[in-house]
Structures are given as C-alpha cells and as structure tokens.
Amino acid sequence: MDFFDFTKDFRREEAPSGFISSDPSSMATEMFESKPIKREVIGTDYVAEIAAKEKLLMSGQLKAEIPGQYSGGMDDLDSNDDMDDEEISKIRLDEEYYKKYRFNLNRDKNLPIYAKREVIVNAINTHQVVILKGETGCGKTTQVPQYILDEGFKSGQYCNIVVTQPRRIGAISIANRVSQERMWEPDTVCSYQVGLHRKQHLEDTRLLYCTTGVLLNSLIRNKTLTHYTHIVLDEVHERDQDMDFLLIVVRRLLATNSRHVKVILMSATIDTREFCDYFSTKVSVPPVISASHGRKHSIEKFYRDQLGSINWKDDPDDGYQARIPDEAYKAAVKIILVVDNMERQAANQSEQSYDDAKSQGAVLIFLPGIYEIDNMAESLGNMTKEEPSMKLFIVRCFSLMTPDAQRDVFSPPPSGFRKIILATNIAESSITVPDVSYVIDFCLTKVLVTDTATNFSSLRLTWASKANCRQRAGRVGRLRSGRVYRMVHKLFYKTNMTEFGVPEMLRLPLQNSVLKAKLLDIAPPIEMLALALSPPNLSDIQNTILLLKEVGALFPTVDGEYCEVDGDITFWGIIMSRLPLDTRLSRLIILGYVFNLLEEAIVIAAGLSMRGLSTEAGRGRLTSDAYWMNYVFADGSGSDLVAIWRIYRTYENMVANGMHQESAEPWARRYHVSLRALKEMHLLVQELKSRCSQLGMISFNLSSSDMPDDLEKAILLKVIIAGAFYPNYFLRSKKTTLEQERDIFHVISGRDPCRTVYFTNFKPAYMGELYTRRIKDLFQELKIPPESIEVTFQPGSQKVFVTFKSDECDTNCTRLINVPGQVLTEVYKSIRMRLYQSNRTFRVMDHNNALNYVQRHGIGTLKEGHWTPPSRPLNVEMLALPSVYEKNMTGLITHVDHCGKFFFQPKSFARCIQNMSEIINTPMHLQYEIQNAGVLTKGMMVLAKRKGTFERAIIVRPETQNNRQPKFFVRFVDYGNTDLMYIEQLRLMTKELLSQYGDLPPRVFECRLALVQPSTMSNTLSRWSRDAKDMLISASKNNIVEIEIYSLVYNVAAVMVHTRDGLLNDKLVEHNLARRADENFMSRQDHDFRIRKQESARYISGPERQQVNEEYLRSCQMPEDLDLTPPPLDKCNMIVMLKGPYSPLETSMFSTIRVGVWKTVKIDNSSVNAVLLDSDPQDNHDQLVVSHSTVESSNGDVLTARGTTLMPNIHGFGPLMTMLFCPTMQIKCNKDCTKYVSILAGLGFDKETMKPYFEEHDMVMNLDVNLYEDDVRMINQMRYNIDTMFFNFEGEELPSLNMNDRVTIYKELRKLVNRLLSKDRSYIELNASNSDFNWEKEDRIEPQPEPFGKRCIFPMHVIPELLEEDIGRRLYLIDNCKKLYKWRNFEGALDILNCKLCNMSLETTPQLRLHLLTQLHRDREKQIGFKNE
C-alpha cells in the first residue's frame, strides 16, 4: 500500500482524467483555435486624407461643420460661427474694470524675456498663433501673460487670458507668484483653477493659470474658444495626451468659430518646425520667437569613448541594447573616484578647501528606475568598504520618496561627506538641487507602454531622448562650473538617440481622448485623432473603441447599426469623461452608486489613482512590517482595495477627532503610510463627490432596517469590484487530481498543511532535534513566540517541519492579522519571510562532535553509531479517541468553540469522570490553596473550579499580574473549555493526585463537523458563524448526543451530529450557515480505512481488533517537539544553508481571457495576495481573483496583476460575475443539452463571418457547479435593473428615475444577489473542449426581449433550454457506478477504470475508493438517482 505511505516517493504516468478546473491551458491540447490570432497593426495611412481636408478647412477653403452637428450635439452651443459676435468680443472695452484694480506697468527688466517684450507683443497682435521658445528660467511663464494684460490695460480693451500648466503645483504656485508680484489680492485679477483646487468666484479674473485638463474640458463643454481672448499653452513639449488633444481642439475651433482668439505656444525645448507645420495655413505661418540667456558657469560634457581606461568593453551580441551592465555601474564608481581625486589635487592650488569642494560637489546620477538605483547604491557601498576614506552621503530620489527623503536631497551633506543623488528622471525638471556639480547620465529611461489590443501595460527600459539628456545636463553649473558624463558613445548619442521622446498618444491608452472626441461631437473619433500632432495607429484607435464598448462607455452601435470603429456615447461614457480617472475606476464608482456603495467606491478609486500611498511603494520590495500593515488594513478581505478603504477611513476618523500633525506623523510611520498622499487623496475624494453630485449620483437614504449589515456590504463590495474590473479575471490554480492532493501531504509527511511549513537542505546527520530552539529563533523577526511553534523531523529526510499551534488565548500579535480560509497567518508570514531571504545560514556541529555531545550529556540513546532522540512514553490504549471499529458513539458535547472545534465525552467515560471528580473534590485534595502566583507555570496541571466542583486543568497563561488580583487562563482537561480564573479558584494537585491522574490523557476528544465548511455568505473569512454555533449548542442541550465518526486525523474527529430532525450538518446547509464540502485527502483516506476495518470486524477476534486499533491510534500520532537545550554556539563548527520555508499550499494563477491564457501570471509584490496559498485545500473549486490593472513583462511572457482582490469562496462566483457584467455571452451545454458546462463571454461576434469582435478579451469560464435557467433569468433581471438606473429620455441630460425608483431597484438588486450567491450548488464534472473560444450561431434559441433595444449597456442573455437526462444515458451511468463499487474492494492490480459520471480515469484501487468519497461523485450519483445497496 505504497499509495498511503508518505515516506516513499510517489510517481505516476499521465493518463487522461477529468477534474474541476477552468484552466484552459491544463485541460485541452494546444490547437490553433485555442490561441488568439495576432491582431494586425494598421498604421497611419488613414491620416493623409483627413489632414489634407483639415488644411483646407484652416485656410478657409472648406466650410466646417458647426461643433455638435456631427451627431446632433449633447450640449447647447455657447457660440456659433457668427462673425459679428466675434467682432463685438474683439473690440469690447473694459475701462471700468481697469480702474477697479491697480495696474503697475513696470516689469522685471533683468529677466531675459524682457528683451523680447516688444517683439512678442507685436507678433501676438498681428498673428493668430505665435510660438515662443525660451530657456528654463527666462521668465516666459510669468511675464508673457502680463505683457498681454498690460497691452489690454493701455488700450482699455477687454482681455481674458488663460495659461495652461502640465502640473497642478505649477499652476497654483505661478498664479500666487504673479499676484504677489503685481500686489493683487489672491483670486482677483490673477487666479488658478486645477482639478482639486477650484476657486468659486472668477468673475474678476483676467489671468487664469490652470492645468491642461481644466482648459480642455472647458473647451469641450463650450465648443468654442471665445470665452478667452488669449490662450497660452505652456510646456507644449511635454506632449501628454491632454496637451495633444487640446492642440487638436484649439486648431479646429480656431478654424471654425473662434478665428479672432490668439494662441501662444511656449516651451524650453519645443520642436519649432513641427509646431509651425501643424498650425500653418496657405495664408499664415506662425512666427517663432526665441528668448535665451547665457550661463554664468561652463559645463563640460564627456562621453564613454572619452573616458579612457574607465570605459568598458561591450558584449558583441549586445547590439546597444538598452540596459546597464555590471561594468557600467563600476565605471560610474570610478568616475566618482576620479572626480574626488581631481578635487583633492585642485585644493592644493586653490583657496577652496577639499572639504568645501566636496560639500558643493554633489554628484547626480540619472538611473531609469528603483531597481537600478538599488544596484548603483550597492556598488557605491562596496566601493566605500574598499576605500574607507571615501565618505559618501547617498540619497535616493524618485517620485514616490517620503518627505524625509526629499529633505535629504536638498540638505547639505554631513561634514566631510560628498552627496551622491541617485535619481530617476524626476530630477530632470521637477527638482533643482543647487549644489550639483557633476551629472553621470546613463541616458536611459523607463516608459509605460500599453498594448491597446490587450490593455496590458508594460514598463519598458529604453534610451532617453536628446531633449531628456539636455534637461539632465542643465542640472549642473548653478553655483560653479560642472561636468556631465554621458555613459554612451558620442556617435551613438548623435546618430541613434532620438531628438524627442515618444508622445503619450502613441504609447498610452486612448480611452479618455476618444471619449473627449465623442463629447466634442465634431467628427468621429478616428477623424479627430488623425489630426493629432503625432497621430496614433488606426488599429490603436479601433482597439480603444472596443475597450470603451467593453466598459460600457460606448454602445456597440451608431444610430442602431453596429460600427467597428465608432459607437454612440452612453451615459456611463459621459460620466467617465467627467471624472478625472481611468475608465475602469469610473466604472467602479458607477457600480458603487448602483449598489449604494458610492462612498466606498469613490475612496477606492481615488486611492488606486494615487501613487505612493505606501511609503515603501516603488521600492524593489516592501519591508516585512510595511507588507503586514497592508494585511492589517485588509482585515482578512484578501483585497488591496479594501485595504485602501480602511486606511482612508482610519485617517478620516483621526482628522475628525482633531489629530494634529505631531500625532499624525508617528501613526503614518508606524503603518508605513504617506500623509502627503493621504491629503492629496482626500482632496480627490472631495472632488469626485462633487462631480458625482453634479451628475445626479448621490448615496441613497435608507432606513436602518434596509441597510445591509457589514457581511452583506463586504460581499456587495467585492461584487462591484468584480464588475468594475471585468475582464481582469484570474483563477487560482487548484490541486485538482487525487495525486496532487496526496502530494500536498506527502511533501510534509502527513502533517497539517494549513499550519505547517518546512525547510530543506538539513541532512539527518546533523541530528536536527538538538537545534529545535534555534530553528524557532528564526521566526523571531516575525514576532511568532517559540511556544507557538513545534519543530519536528522525519527519519531519513532532509526537511525540517515547523508547525504552528493555534490558541484562542494566545496574545501573539500575529493572530491580530486576519487571513481568509483555514491557513494560519503564521504560514503566510513564513512564506513572505522566504521571499526576502530564501537561504538562511545555520550553525551545527559536525556529525562526530554531535555524537560525542549527546553521549556526554546523556541525550537520547546511542547504539552502533546511530542516535535515537529521547521520546515520551505513550499509552495509546488510554487515549479517549474513537476506535477504528467505532462508527457511531453516544455521549456529551462538553464544550463548543465553534462548529469546527468542539469536545465530545463518550458516554462510556461517565463513571470514570464521576469517580475522578469525587476523589478530586475530597477536602484532603483541595487543601493546597495558591498563595504565590509565581509557582504557576505554563502547562502545569492544577485543579480549577468548574460549575461548583474542582476538575483537572492546565495553566495556559496569566491574564495579568499587576496590583490587582492575579488571573489565569486555564484549560479544563476533561471538558475542553478554556476559562479565566481568579487565583483563589485554583488549587495545586497533591502528589497522590498527580501520580494517579497526572498522566491520564483527557477524557474528551476534539471534533469538527464533517463534509461541511462555513458558508461565505455567513462569514467572509470562512469562519463558523455565531448562528451555526448556537444550532450546535442547541442540538447538544438534551444531554446525550449521537455522533457518527467520519474520520480521525491529527487526533481530531470529523463527525456527523444526529438530531431528531436529521443530521445537524445538513441542517446548517439548509439554513445557509454552511456549504457542502469535500474532506481533505487525509480525512478521506482515514474514512476509507475505517469503513474497510468496520466491514471486516465480524471476522476478527477481540484481541486482534484491540491490537489493530492500538496500531491505528499510534499511527495517528505525529512526532513530538522535544524542545532540547541546543549545544553552545562555539561548538557548532559547521555552517548549513537552510532553504525555505516552503508550503505545499503555494499556488499560482492563470488568466481567463484568451490573450492571457498561455502567459505566466504573478501578483505584484506589494499586494496582500503576493503570498498566494490554497487557503481551502480540501475545496477543489476555482476561486476568482480580480486585479485593478495588469502589467506585461517586456518580453510579453509574464503578466503581473496589481491591486488584487480575492473573491469570496462561493462556488460559481466567477461564472456568475462574468454573466452579470460581461457585454454579452453564450452559455454552452453538454452534447446532450442536459446541463450548462461553460460560458464564453466578450463583445460578441459578427453573425456573418462568425469572427469575434474582440477575440483578445474573449473569456471562457468552465463550470464546476450546476447553473440553471432560473439563474440566467435572475442575471438578466439584474442587468435590466442596472440599465434602468441610468435610463434617460432623449434631450434629458440626467437619468429620468426619481430617488424612490432608484431605491426600489437597489433593493431588488440586493435581493437577487443574495438569492444567486446563497444557492447550494451541486458539483458537476468538467466538460472541456478545444472549441470553448468559438462563438456559435443561436438561430434555434428564442432571443430574449430587449426593453431598451440596441441602446443598452447590458443586453439580455439568450437562455438555452435544458433537457431531461435521457433514460438510456442514465441507465448507462448507473451501470458504470455499479461496476465501480464492485471493484472497490479489489486488492490486486487494476486495469484503468473510467468514472463516466465525473469524466475521471482511475488507475488503482485506492484511487477508486477515494474518488467514490468525493463530493463531486456523490453529487453526480444523486443527479442520476443512484444508490449503492
């Protein structure tokens, strides 16, 4: 019976088998149909015709459509093409306004821009568009708008100027600086407007600084430029999407209804030729004005080929790949050494000392990312070890750095140190450090690129542009002459590196730009984006439109007809365009409104859009403490998004309670949270609430009786997360075959995988039992106390097994961190510890010294050179455990912790318990009252008072030992309960009692309910609820209870509790307090063993049965932790490299969408799900994980899921969410049409060509539980209700429903969600097919009526009709079942049998027997009406 022997290796040959899994890559052979076809990239050939037409329009040779005429318009036009109105606007006088405020015409003449003042003013007066190129610091941003305003003052003409800034902080600070310079009251003549800081009263404002997005949204809303006389677009070189689209809008409106508005383009590094061509017409070319100023200090530039011996050799196969080899880091270190030596020598010939030169000679090293910063810091650290005289003050500088780190960047270094700043491209322009004298530029950058066909983003390492490098070089020479070292060859820099970077419109998602084009309503999105300065590929626009249809922003149709490259905008699309968020985050807010979780959705969306909420974010890996703070905030939800909500709520509560900065900072440091990011997040939350309110989206006012409780709210929150981020769905891989289940336990030699981890590479010759305490010390950094750890070994194995004990009275802080499922938190912490450090050094004695040590100290026994560790004697016949031959037992349930842990006292022990109690409670045995609490130690047996009499008890721990009367937690040995007792309620045991009862095992045994697990609908952590506990207590109140023993594993009996109304286990399922579940492999194996022994009991004599039972009970005992005193460290002369710890429950995920099926999936290192374990190992059903976003590796092979949420372990949850939130789907039946077996979801397909519209995002969910026609009807009802919530009549801006109707829909949705998720669904066999991704014609199926026609976001699903199982097929399956049971007790070699019910191949008799015990097979038997006689 090697199958059950965990000490032996287990191997098998692969054979066809069925199992419960949705993993397409593991269930089907790789065929052409199973992989997506690579979508053809269509370039920019479409642009030429559209651009030529636009040039004619700009020259006045072609009449333009009035904005809004393209599709009838959604907003009333504020302006039209009436030239008289523009003439009036142009000559409007504003003399009264100029008298109201002080206008001083004296400008700063020291600024370089002043020399060009007259040229600039004249050019603006005579040209529609002017291009101004001025170096950073010349004064263009503050002065040019003032020059224009001064001209207006002189002529008395109306002037209204708007100036855009790429960053919020820039708009605010510049507006304040101009107001201060002109001595205007803030927010009068000059003001600012940014997304999160909006001034309410701007009537008197004539000079407005705003972010690019604010102006863009204003122009889209008004569809004219004539609200302003002058539009100044600053920093146009940055080329973000908002700027590029703003240029499209400005150019179009200049050519249509705003010909007299003046536009000024400004930048330090503008490509003047490109912008001139863009705004040129046949009759007008924009003038270019340059304003520059010379530098006070010179800058020398050096390239790699000029570094002499510092240069390194290239790999001939490298081909100038964008990367930093190890030699390049070393070269940078050598440059610093050269610089230092150069300054040391110069100090001898200069008045400036060497120390002064160092303090002013900071080195700024530009690196592409955090990983490279860490590598550079490590190289510098190694150098300082070799050169102690080199004292370096190393500072990291990146976008997510903490405020303390920012201060270090600007602060002078400690005396005698040189400051080395390791920076990303944030230091190009956002940060200026005056004391930088040297720049080492690796000429690299990281850019975020999104594949529009997959919506996967990837951070790619690429060569920086020359413009980037010039900006970086400009960081030196502020206080003295400087040097720039570019770590590329000069020829490569000049010929291979591009002049400018790739604009966002060519590398980032285009959703927001397309939505803006739809709102502007001038032309279809393709025609609008073709007018961009750098038009995107046509395929990118097409893919973006598909993505917008997927999220519900666009209808699939235009005027009722399907259009591949366009779609009418939905009200969801309008909402998404008005919220400053990614479309999926806006979708989260929309669904939050639908399910009355608007507050939660807004906070989560704001948090996900913020960078740097965690102070450790952006680093290569989170520190242990920072990572576990995420767990604290996630509170067992398995969701990064819930953690964001709880962080914000904690911060908000502290602010409301008057928390000051002094107390806020320690809190933020403790929980590794950025206060700055939280404050920004708070502003964004307020902004989102305001915008939602304007859109009619406010929370419903419900009575207290209608409010969902916390449990229902937690499930609804995960429902809307699943809806918002469809199709970012992943399934957690399961151990789906019997062999895989067995392997879980084989790896840890039969121990409990939910509480055990293991190390490897520890040879038996090391005699590990000597070092158990030292192994426990490895977990000190996790704050796991040694008394909560058991360390054991397996003879002949190189593994060290570490098992964690659970104790409800334990004060271990680890227990304060909740995790979902059955796995202990300590296991998660241990695996996370390995991710930081996979190998741990461990000191041991060599084998000979160890043998001498144990012999000298009398530890264990030594025989013929073989050491046997000491062991405690065990009389298994004294254990109060059920015999292998006992199926049913009667007795008392003495104590209930919950349905997964209660204690049973067999009726046969009643007399023993009574006699022992009588002896214990005689006066002579109660005479030792405890005067000094110090005599009590953990684990000591005492007498404690229980219900008026004293009983045996074990000291668990003291509750307190201060000035108050001491209390102790004690566990009653013979009853199982733990209570807190005063010291006077305790007695020391007499010697007589100790000798008589001290070694007597407990007269109870621990039980749990078999074949059921807690319902997720009653507890999101998969813990047993109070209601379930009350039902068990109620069933045990009538004293004697009958239980049926299913199995005995780890001395815990899995039982069924009989009541007058049937099995309690079944009653809990009926009341939705439990769900039916498989037992784990060990339990099923034990159950099978017990059944066979019980069947053969009548053929075995009494003594033989007793011997078999003793052997059985002895085999149930696990090795003990000996807790020996370890040898002194000075005697441990060998170093062992321990590997681990590992868990057999470590698992992975796979993507459900077609484009991701064959890719490896990882979870972001900072996620609470980064340690992904199979938290319910006995449950062979898929569990859904949803990510906020997905990042693709540079080679495209690996996906990283970010912002993940582990969905509730409700069977069928993934398919139900897919059906509820997908654009459309087909539910497929088995070949007999008797059950639904899979779901194909996506945007649908062309009914003529049968090709999918968006095959990359088509998703397959194979069903492992039964779904019925009624389920699909409920899903359709919910989809209809969601659409109804946003229904509006033509011409109405907001939805038509009043608040009462919305509340009614919300209540109906809640009721339907509860009905769907509360069903106890029977298991079905897997029906995998290579055609799962093929859309099929549904001509024979009656389509569902569509209340909203083709203008619905969630159309009704077609419902295939299910047929009854054919009687012939049923008889065939019943006959197959009989055959399986016939072979069940066969002991010889077995030919492969097939279970036709479950599509399972069975190769051995043990496999057959254990398969027959699975919930899948039992459910299938029930479905065909089979009963084993």
UniProtKB/Swiss-Prot annotation:
It holds the Pfam family TUDOR. The keyword Cytoplasm applies. A motif (DEAH box) lies at residues 234-237. Residues 933-996 form the Tudor domain. Residues 349-521 form the Helicase C-terminal domain. Its EC number is 3.6.4.13. It is an enzyme of class 3 (hydrolase). The keyword ATP-binding applies. GO terms for biological process: dorsal appendage formation; germarium-derived oocyte fate determination; global gene silencing by mRNA cleavage; heterochromatin formation; intracellular mRNA localization; mitotic chromosome condensation; oocyte karyosome formation; oocyte localization involved in germarium-derived egg chamber formation. It catalyses: ATP + H2O = ADP + phosphate + H(+). Keywords: ATP-binding, Cytoplasm, Developmental protein, Differentiation, Helicase, Hydrolase, Meiosis, Nucleotide-binding, Oogenesis, RNA-mediated gene silencing, Spermatogenesis. One of its GO terms (cellular component) is P granule. Residues 121-288 form the Helicase ATP-binding domain. One of its GO terms (molecular function) is RNA binding. It is found in: Cytoplasm. SMART domains: DEXDc (SM00487), HA2 (SM00847), HELICc (SM00490), TUDOR (SM00333). Probable ATP-binding RNA helicase which plays a central role during spermatogenesis and oogenesis by repressing transposable elements and preventing their mobilization, which is essential for the germline integrity. Acts via the piRNA metabolic process, which mediates the repression of transposable elements during meiosis by forming complexes composed of piRNAs and Piwi and govern the methylation and subsequent repression of transposons. Involved in the repression of LTR retrotransposon copia. This is Probable ATP-dependent RNA helicase spindle-E. It comes from Drosophila ananassae (Fruit fly). The gene is spn-E.
